[in-house]
Amino acid sequence: MGPETPLYHFGPTAQILLLGALITAAPLLWVLRRVQGRGPAALLHRLTWVTLFLTFDLVLFGAYTRLSDSGLGCPDWPGCYGQATPIGASAQIQAAQDLMPTGPVTHGKAWVEMLHRYLATGVGGLILVLCAGAWWLRLQGHPKRSVWWPTFTLFWVCIQGAFGALTVTMKLFPAIVTLHLLGGVFLLALLAWQATQTADAAPVSGVAAHTGKGLRIALALAGGLLWVQIALGGWVSTNYAVLVCDTFPQCQGSYWPDMAFAQGFELWRPLGHTSWGELLSFQALTAIHYVHRLMAYGVIAAMLALAWLLRHHRMHRWALGLLALVCLQCLTGLSNVVLGWPMPAAILHTGGAAAMMVLIVLAWQRTRSQPLTPIAA
């Protein structure tokens, strides 16, 4: 990016918002047709599930954007060289591509980055509709339906947009990129929490609630461990530390390779450098990778224990789903190491972690809304 290109150029904002509105309209119209005549509560319930699905797609596309090195495909925000689409910026993109054919700015990377922004704008529009609909229902006399979860979700998606901008303008600063990933997973969790709520749902009380208390504690602990592991995985990816260990279970021929933990986990520093401006050492990258690998063993054990608890409480399909995701994570994680970080495996690894978080949140809600009867010993 040349010095004449501003980091922020708000000229194309209206056009980008219009494109986002068109993306918002498509699933909204589809849901309207599906729930025709069933009332606004049913509309919001179905729309929340659709928004959850599209947000999951957005997380996957964000992973592709990062893994294809397209994050700086348009080096300003919210547009591309001050234009709403890469078509209008084709001359600037071509000049940058001629200067660095394999650099961060190419026509393909510009389109990937802008498509990610368009989809994010569309998802933001859907969340705005959900928030407005929740408040409208409250004003129409539906006190059982919370307005604060949709309101907080709208606030959070705005925070996500800000982190998306900083990801570009701070040139893929690892801490910002990792926080952006975590924010996307948290957004999924918020939507999953709301997707299972209906106007007439009520928490389980009495003996049934007490019976499921241990399972809810286990779900919370497993979710916390998974959250830490996703953060570590994001740190591996954003620091490009995947390939420093290309064997399993050993790393560089050792079960405890040479590592520089303090340098590897110095959080506030630019990509590839320490806060002092020195190049990040190979030992630091090794520490980043190996900590994620070691944490994975603990997370796998926790998820297997959680699957057993789910089965013990007659949530058989939930247990099978969790086991399937654990297997997916193991296979894709190993593929990333021994096959040289193939794109499909890397994207599926991100998707598997996000799906696991959604499953845990949905299972938590299930224990609150339906009584659980443990299998007799």
Protein language model regions, located:
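Extracytosolic (periplasmic/ER-lumenal) interhelical loops and adjacent juxtamembrane/interface segments
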Residues: 2-3, 70-114, 242-285
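N-terminal signal-anchor transmembrane alpha helix
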Residues: 47-69, 224-236
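Alpha-helical transmembrane segments
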Residues: 24-34, 131-132, 192-195, 306-308, ...
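Interfacial helix-loop-helix junctions of multi-pass membrane proteins
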Residues: 2-11, 61-74, 155-181, 235-247, ...
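Membrane-interface helix-loop-helix junctions at transmembrane boundaries of multi-pass membrane enzymes
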Residues: 132-151, 307-322
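Membrane-interface loop-to-helix entry segments
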Residues: 11-20, 111-129, 174-187, 287-305, ...
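A juxtamembrane structural motif centered on a specific transmembrane helix
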Residues: 190-214, 218, 358-377
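Transmembrane alpha-helices
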Residues: 1-39
